[in-house]
Design a protein with these regions (language model features):
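Gram-negative host-targeted secretion-system effectors, predominantly Type III and Type IV
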Residues: 1-198
């Protein structure tokens, strides 16, 4: 077990975590749940991080982290700071319209072409209610077609074309499975980016 933990720790993006004031010792002592979520590409629970400001002072703030890869496949770390509210005008990367911000605030998942690190890709966007930050993942990173096939096989149901299209657009679909109401759809807080809610 200890060996497994050590191997997993070796894969942590230490240089990226150090920017947030989490040195190797602190990273190794993170709770296992946090390390596992980081390694799996999931969004971590809220944690305190310290950042060196340009004026030399240290700013400590709560945020969630998520490990991903850049366009070259190198590890990258996304930080979702806790905010009082979604400030859609300040987020230049996502370039949200007021209408998109309102949809996110209502809990909707939206799909949008986003320019990240010079690469324009289709992304799913979802507002994290705890941090008021927008979580985003490439549409291609969420193996949606496979998730839908797996769900159909396991639950012995067949989704119609319209239902599949709704899910692709980020809208949840309510189904009746074995006499039980179930909602399925995109959830970027989940590792696989997809959730079945009973």
């Amino acid at each position: 077990m200890e060996m497994h933990n050590r191997n997993q720790s070796d894969l942590l993006p230490y240089e990226k975590l150090a920017i947030l004031g989490i040195d190797r010792e602190k990273a190794d002592s993170l709770p296992m749940e946090v390390k596992e979520k980081l390694m799996a590409g999931e969004v971590t629970p809220i944690m305190q991080v310290s950042i060196n400001a340009r004026n030399g002072s240290i700013i400590t703030m709560p945020m969630k982290l998520q490990m991903t890869t850049d366009k070259n496949g190198a590890p990258a770390l996304i930080a979702y700071p806790v905010r009082a509210e979604l400030n859609w005008e300040r987020n230049k990367v996502l370039n949200l319209t007021q209408q998109e911000a309102e949809r996110l605030a209502r809990g909707e998942v939206i799909q949008k072409a986003v320019n990240v690190n010079g690469e324009k890709t289709q992304q799913y966007l979802q507002l994290d209610p705890e941090t008021k930050s927008v979580i985003h993942r490439r549409v291609t990173d969420i193996k949606l077609e496979q998730r839908l096939k797996d769900m159909e096989k396991v639950n012995d149901i067949e989704l119609g074309m319209q239902q599949k299209q709704q899910i692709r657009e980020g809208k949840p679909v309510e189904l009746n499975v074995g006499g039980e109401k179930v909602s399925v759809g995109i959830d970027l807080k989940e590792q696989q980016g997809f959730k079945i809610i009973k």
